[in-house]
């Protein structure tokens, strides 16, 4: 009996020793294979192509296979994979279904001269001017790889702009999701942003007439998003730097990274947008609606009127002017001094009064974008009629028939010399196209 007990104890002890040895061996093998896998991943990352910001005549022809360093835009997560590539493969098929063309990293690297043609810096990354192999000039936005929302915003822009087409929206041509980089390729807007024309001394001040035209263009773009798109889309970040101007000074709404379809997640945990343009109702309720875009558009209207940035006390001036608006002198006090008195005061008062409705604290009191388009259209039509009447001679039976009227020169239509022909062209075609909203 005693011998059997000793044998049992020896057997159990031997089993435990063997179990411990096997466990240690398994752990050692696991750590060995994991370390080997990390070395392989590290080697593959080192072969990634990165931009060389090199100046010189031959910089467009230089390609780099350099090792990724701390200054590279390619960031890696703790597990060794590129942050941008985490989960992207699961959605790549969805993006392809949008119909937007996919470009290779190497083609964009060459088109931007190794990313040396910087033309702007947005909230989500740098923007480069690029000349494609076809000769087409485009804008390439490289989304910042250290942005936690970057990939989500990339997905949003591709999916939305893949189905949204309107002459007052910036057209997305293609995208690139390769080598840890996410890039968006847009139609190149040669005149830059509205903000640059309002605040940069490099540009002549925009005439009042052109400012109203720009406001109408933006309103039409937003009207399409709210009422023409299916399902409707809320932009959520209307501001002067997100309004781009083409060669003919037609305004287009850009940057849809924060946009959402109206049917999806109206409630947001975090406040997103730009200070100065944010709807107070959205700030308090965390819920964004079409009327949130209307509020942002109202701020943009006052920005066009006053030539002042909302982050530099614009709305405080607006509230002070509104107190005196009943005496018909309030709104004149905030008009951009760069206009040098070249504006119709009655028109300014009408636009400003309507802009004030757009920023009402109560969303239900704000107009919708369709109402805004109609009001701005009427303002321009009335202006057009006034100009025609001003150019027409007063009938007088006592005088001989007046000589033929000489058409007013384009130079007298606006103080903006470089923009005169566009204003003249728009005025002449107003009767046939002012209410037309073509969807490309």
Curated annotation (Swiss-Prot):
The modification Phosphoserine is found at residue 241. The chain crosses the membrane at residues 8-28. Kinase activity is stimulated by calcium/calmodulin, but blocked by chlorpromazine. Coiled coil: none annotated. GO terms for biological process: cold acclimation; response to cold. It catalyses: L-seryl-[protein] + ATP = O-phospho-L-seryl-[protein] + ADP + H(+); L-threonyl-[protein] + ATP = O-phospho-L-threonyl-[protein] + ADP + H(+). It comes from the Eukaryota. It is found in: Cell membrane; Endosome membrane. Pfam families: PK_Tyr_Ser-Thr (PF07714). Disruption phenotype: Increased sensitivity to chilling and freezing temperatures, associated with a delayed induction of cold-responsive genes. Impaired MAP kinases activation in response to cold. PANTHER family: CALCIUM_CALMODULIN-REGULATED RECEPTOR-LIKE KINASE 1 ISOFORM X1, OS01G0750732 PROTEIN. Interacts with calmodulin (CaM) in a calcium- (Ca(2+)-) dependent manner. Binds to MEKK1. Belongs to the protein kinase superfamily. Ser/Thr protein kinase family. This is Calcium/calmodulin-regulated receptor-like kinase 1. It comes from Arabidopsis thaliana. The lineage of its organism: Eukaryota, Viridiplantae, Streptophyta, Embryophyta, Tracheophyta.
């Amino acid at each position: 009996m005693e011998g059997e007990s000793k044998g049992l104890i020896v057997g159990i002890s031997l089993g435990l020793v063997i179990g411990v040895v096997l466990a240690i061996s398994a752990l050692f093998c696991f750590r060995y294979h994991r370390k080997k896998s990390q070395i392989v991943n590290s080697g593959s990352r080192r072969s990634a192509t990165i931009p060389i910001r090199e100046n010189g005549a031959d910089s467009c022809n230089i390609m780099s296979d350099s090792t990724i360093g701390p200054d590279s835009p390619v960031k890696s997560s703790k597990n060794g994979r590129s942050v941008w590539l985490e989960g992207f493969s699961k959605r790549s098929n969805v993006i392809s279904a949008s119909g937007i063309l996919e470009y290779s990293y190497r083609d964009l690297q060459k088109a931007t001269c190794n990313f040396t043609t910087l033309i702007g810096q947005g909230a989500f990354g740098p923007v480069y001017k690029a000349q494609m192999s076809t000769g087409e000039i485009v804008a390439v936005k490289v989304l910042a790889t250290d942005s936690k929302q970057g990939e989500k915003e990339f997905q949003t822009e591709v999916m939305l702009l893949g189905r949204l087409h309107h002459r007052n929206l910036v057209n997305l041509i293609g995208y690139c999701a390769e080598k840890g980089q996410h890039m968006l390729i847009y139609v190149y807007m040669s005149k830059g942003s509205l903000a640059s024309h309002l605040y940069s001394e490099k540009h002549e001040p925009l005439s009042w007439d052109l400012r109203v035209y720009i406001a109408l263009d933006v309103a039409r773009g937003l009207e399409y998003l709210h009422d023409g798109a299916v399902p409707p889309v809320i932009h959520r970040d209307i501001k002067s730097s997100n309004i781009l101007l083409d060669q003919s000074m037609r305004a287009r709404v850009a940057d849809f990274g924060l946009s959402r379809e109206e049917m999806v997640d109206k409630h947001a945990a975090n406040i997103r947008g730009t200070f100065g343009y944010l709807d107070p109702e959205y700030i308090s309720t965390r819920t964004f609606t079409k009327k949130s875009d209307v509020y942002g558009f109202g701020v943009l209207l006052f920005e066009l009127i006053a030539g002042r940035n909302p982050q530099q006390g614009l709305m405080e001036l607006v509230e002070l002017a509104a107190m005196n608006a009943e005496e018909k002198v309030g709104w004149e006090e905030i008009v951009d001094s760069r206009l040098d008195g070249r504006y119709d005061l009655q028109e300014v008062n009408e636009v400003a009064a309507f802009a004030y409705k757009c920023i009402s604290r109560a969303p239900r009191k704000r107009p919708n974008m369709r109402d805004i388009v109609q009001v701005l259209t009427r303002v321009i039509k009335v202006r057009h009629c006034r100009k025609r009447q001003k150019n027409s001679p007063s009938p007088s039976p006592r005088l001989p028939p007046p000589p033929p009227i000489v058409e007013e020169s384009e130079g007298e239509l606006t103080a903006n010399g470089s923009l005169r022909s566009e204003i003249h062209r728009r005025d002449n075609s107003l009767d046939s196209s002012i209410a037309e909203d073509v969807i490309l």
